[in-house]
Amino acid sequence: MLGICRGRRKFLAASLTVLFVPAVTWIYLFAGSFEDGKPVSLSPLESQPHSPRYTASSQRDRESLEVRMREVEEENRVLRKQLSLAQGRSPSHHRGNHSKTYSMEEGTGDSESLRAGIVAGNSSECGQQPAVEKCETIHVAIVCAGYNASRDVVTLVKSVLFHRRNPLHFHLIADAIAKQILATLFQTWMVPAVRIDFYDADELKSEVSWIPNKHYSGIYGLMKLVLTKTLPSNLERVIVLDTDITFATDIAELWAVFHKFKGQQVLGLVENQSDWYLGNLWKNHRPWPALGRGYNTGVILLLLDKLRKMKWEQMWRLTAERELMSMLSTSLADQDIFNAVIKQNPFLVYQLPCFWNVQLSDHTRSEQCYRDVSDLKVIHWNSPKKLRVKNKHVEFFRNLYLTFLEYDGNLLRRELFGCPSEADVNSENLQKQLSEPDEDDLCYEFRRERFTVHRTHLYFLHYEYEPASDNTDVTLVAQLSMDRLQMLEAICKHWEDPISLALYLSDAEAQQFLRYAQGSEVLMSRHNVGYHIVYKEGQFYPVNLLRNVAMKHISTPYMFLSDIDFLPMYGLYEYLRKSVTQLDLANTKKALIIPAFETLRYRLSFPKSKAELLSMLDMGTLFTFRYHVWTKGHAPTNFAKWRTATTPYRVEWEADFEPYVVVRKDCPEYDRRFVGFGWNKVAHIMELDAQEYEFTVLPNAYMIHMPHAPSFDITKFRSNKQYRICLKTLKEEFQQDMSRHYGFAALKYLTAENNS
């Protein structure tokens, strides 16, 4: 308290200094500008010697006065700058925007409270406390449905997390798709002092499905009406946000506005910044009833406890039923109904200053809300055109949005010091696991990677696929980084059926991928490709984690474990479905091997049959995969036998065997200790053998590896001795773990390794 008083005394002293110095200066200059009781101009143009009274001495005096005046003005400018900084650091700054008034934006009865806020913010009374306590939890509700909205929510949440200083509790009204995506995202994001609760949007459909709605948000655009019924009964207040919102300030400032509600005010809203509700946008335009310009519901402050007491549910239903008799449907979803209720009950609304919802719609007048960047609090992209909307300041707004769109979300994992938080079991387990490896161990970074939790965004693009009813469907599974993006279109042309891909990208690269995909006719025509973004963290490429993510999120009973550099033969999908049935994969432990070949040519006339492939093999256009570098990796496939085989044949496991296989979706995961280059597939095939999988080579299947520049990890493997030493150490530890897990039968792997 004493510190606050001292701060205010400094603030008052600085204010008096700024006022006092100019006053004394101008008195001094004014007195000095008289000679013999007559005024003398200080203007350089008027001070030319045109009178006998003019002397060299008086000219020097005037020049010195002008120099002194400029010095005083510069001192005054510096003092003003210091004063503005002091205002920015003062506690009153965090109570809301009390220092600015916009009479045209304030609602009835609001100007008094705003003026009171200004007085309170600038008074020297030391007993006043901040409107939002340091560790007070701020509650935010968001309606989210579908794949695209899930991406938008991430950008919104980033902007909120970037500025926040308080614990947050997000209440997400989500459909099954959004829940799966966002639950995984927040679970792997592990942001401290953030709690997430989900509410099933599909269960709420019956509450609003009777309302015809023409808005592009569909039925989900009406669900804000039922928040009083949906959210916990003990929740008193909540900030409700659209998914197309971007914050440019601490959300606690908006939360503090709740303390300014008076009487029966239960809704905090910003006036609509277009002429939509005035009905003059085009001829015969007939909007829903609204108070003046109406209000925009992209940002809402809801006093839930009072709304429940007022029987809000009954209030909005009766209003909607009455208006629908003449309007037939809503045009702006819940916003039309909120405005119709407010038209009948204007006392319900507290009008927020318009900078809390700067609307960038097609007919907006939002530029009247702000004079400079510091006025902006919340930006609302409430046009179907989103970033393509026309606005004279749209470039600035777009850059602000892109800042959060591409911002590294891992940097938002910072702790809120001084605020107690609930114990997070996952976080505690992670810290325990990370503390186990010895930091002095030369392979510490390798061991640490095994426990690193990577932020994961499932189904980054729209996904839609219904598996075949005969239970023979196969999904191609692969992983990639940004430098292999060019392979996607080629793979999609060769494999027209379901694909599950894990992409290892930064936040900025994820947006580059999105733009690339949206600009590709081939990729946009496919809805059966699941793109799962695993965000970058650490120095190694987590190849086996990526494979596990892609494997885990398939909707078919079988999967083809491939790599992004391989193109499968045309028609492989149908051939695999037949083979799955013929070899009874559903009831047996089999791994079907797809023989792998490679070409050194970037432009290849892809063989359309086995006969064509054999011809190219004989001519030296194709080779068996890694025949000159790592023969042992695919030698057990027995390519000599494959050339003449017409029926599937069984092969035995051998050391360093790493074929590409088709297996059931319940097969073991890849071992996460192997990152970067080396032993990642070998270890998996070894475990399949330990679990008594039978390896069967398909006689009429093949895949071809396309050439590319060496990866960063293989370069490190070849050039870094310590990298190779650590890989060998991890390999030995894996073999020991196999022996402990599978017993005597696993000893053959140690023997085979010693003999190889």
UniProtKB/Swiss-Prot annotation:
Described purpose of this protein according to its UniProt entry: Bifunctional glycosyltransferase with both alpha-1,3-xylosyltransferase and beta-1,3-glucuronyltransferase activities involved in the maturation of alpha-dystroglycan (DAG1) by glycosylation leading to DAG1 binding to laminin G-like domain-containing extracellular proteins with high affinity. Elongates the glucuronyl-beta-1,4-xylose-beta disaccharide primer structure initiated by B4GAT1 by adding repeating units [-3-Xylose-alpha-1,3-GlcA-beta-1-] to produce a heteropolysaccharide.
Cofactor info, note text: Binds 2 Mn(2+) ions per subunit. The xylosyltransferase part binds one Mn(2+) and the beta-1,3-glucuronyltransferase part binds one Mn(2+).
Bias type Polar residues, positions: 44-58
Domain of life the protein comes from: Eukaryota
Binding site for Mn(2+) 1: D242, D244
Molecular function as annotated in GO: glucuronosyltransferase activity; hexosyltransferase activity; manganese ion binding; xylosyltransferase activity
Region feature Disordered, mapped onto this chain: 42-63, 81-109
Natural source organism: Gallus gallus (Chicken)
Region Glucuronyltransferase activity: start-end pairs: 414-756
Alphabetized InterPro entries for the sequence: Glyco_trans_8, Nucleotide-diphossugar_trans, Xyl/GlcA_transferase
Lumenal topological domain residue ranges: 32-756
Glycosylation (residues): N97, N122, N148, N272
Membrane topology: Single-pass type II membrane protein
EC number: 2.4.-.-, 2.4.2.-, 2.4.1.-
Region: Xylosyltransferase activity, residue numbers: 138-413
A Pfam family hit: Glyco_transf_49
Coiled-coil intervals, chain numbering: 55-90
UniProt family annotation: In the C-terminal section; belongs to the glycosyltransferase 49 family.
Protein name, UniProt field: Xylosyl- and glucuronyltransferase LARGE1
Cytoplasmic topology ranges: 1-10
Annotated keywords: Coiled coil, Glycoprotein, Glycosyltransferase, Golgi apparatus, Manganese, Membrane, Metal-binding, Multifunctional enzyme, Signal-anchor, Transferase, Transmembrane, Transmembrane helix
